[in-house]
Amino acid sequence: MKYLSVLALLLFTGQAIAADGPLVEKVRKANDRFKDVKVAIAEGYAPIPCASGLTGGAMGIHYVNGDLLKSGKVDVEHPQAIMYEPQAGGKLDLIAVEYIAFKGPASLEGHLFNFVSEPNRYGLDKFYEMHVWAWRENPTGAFADMNPKVSCDAALSP
């Protein structure tokens, strides 16, 4: 009973987030270079429009590397997509990365990817993906697709 009380306290206070902490921290350290979007562009990433959630929140602007997408490799240091939230004045804030594989089930460091069937909003064949919100806290989880704390509003502004 004592352990259940401690677990309940940890869950209630939000301190139990550490369960996904090691991978999030590893991803952050391996990809911090992408805070400067020029680095992403130099490494072959190109932008696709900001992706908003159907029921709120967003994923942000994805910078996708076609060569990494085709490679089929899952490597913590080379995500297939890098995600930025647009800010006023055109600034982009690094918020997350996305790992994508067309064969699966796919995983990274023991974390299984989500399966995306076809047809899908991206017009792609079925695939597996995992977002890692390493630079922006996500109340729905560090590996959730959408983040209610992210917006595409600045991308839509003139």
Segments and roles (model prediction):
Residues M1-L4:
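Positively charged n-region of N-terminal signal peptides that target proteins for export
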Residues T13-G14:
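N-terminal signal peptide c-region/cleavage motif recognized by signal peptidases
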Residues A19-P158:
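Primary mode marks residue(s) on the alpha4-beta5-alpha5 output face of response regulator receiver
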